């Protein structure tokens, strides 16, 4: 799985930070081999086709959030249905993806990667407004309180979390109590702050074909 994540970054030509701390270390496969995996073919001149470019953008954002094709397509299609009803469909799509519980756990620093965050959510490590939630796709809402279950805080995975969070900066729409290991949603995700690694308009074009 980890090897495949490294190949994903190399294939898409950019670091997507899919493996947490390793991505920031010299061991990062993209740093060592910043080219696509497999036999290296002679590159042809010219730009990639519109279809290939939009496909690459779609793959990049999908992999960044760690979603399956079915999951990602559903988010895009549902967002496209809101065309003309919302001010910015790109912001709408990113907002929904950012508000997934697994992504929020990652953004808060409670997990080192979205993959790890998804596993922790699935194993019911967290409470939303005092109630256990184990659905990674759960959409957090404004004023939701997100906390690690008290008896889970002693687990090895959280042993150094309080110290690690001292250096953590969270998105402006989240408020983090670094001592209590508790957070609250205080706003909405901001597209400019998220800085997605893909051109959203091309993704909409891909699924509109």
Map each language-model feature to its residues.
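Short, intrinsically disordered, mixed-charge
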Residues: 107, 122-123
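Short, well-ordered loop/turn sites that connect or cap secondary structure elements
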Residues: 120-121, 140
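Ferredoxin-like alpha/beta domains used as RNA- or RNAP-binding modules
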Residues: 1-108, 112, 134-209
């Amino acid at each position: 799985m980890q090897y495949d994540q490294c190949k994903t970054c190399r294939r898409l030509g950019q670091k997507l930070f899919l493996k947490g701390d390793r991505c920031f270390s010299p061991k990062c496969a993209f740093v060592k081999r910043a080219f696509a995996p497999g036999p290296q073919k002679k590159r042809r001149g010219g730009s990639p086709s519109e279809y290939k470019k939009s496909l690459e953008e779609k793959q990049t954002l999908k992999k960044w959030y760690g979603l399956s094709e079915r999951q990602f397509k559903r988010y895009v299609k549902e967002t496209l249905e809101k065309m003309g009803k919302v001010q910015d469909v790109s912001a709408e799509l990113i907002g929904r993806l950012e508000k997934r519980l697994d992504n929020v756990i990652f953004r808060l620093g409670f997990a080192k990667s979205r993959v790890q965050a998804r596993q922790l959510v699935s194993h019911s490590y967290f409470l939303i407004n005092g109630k256990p939630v184990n659905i990674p796709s759960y959409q957090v809402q404004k004023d939701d309180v997100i906390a690690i279950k008290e008896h889970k805080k002693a687990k090895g995975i959280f042993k150094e979390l309080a110290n690690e969070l001292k250096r953590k900066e969270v998105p402006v729409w989240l408020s983090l109590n670094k001592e209590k290991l508790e957070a609250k949603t205080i706003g909405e995700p901001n597209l400019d702050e998220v800085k997605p690694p893909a051109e959203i308009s091309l993704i909409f074009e891909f699924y509109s074909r």
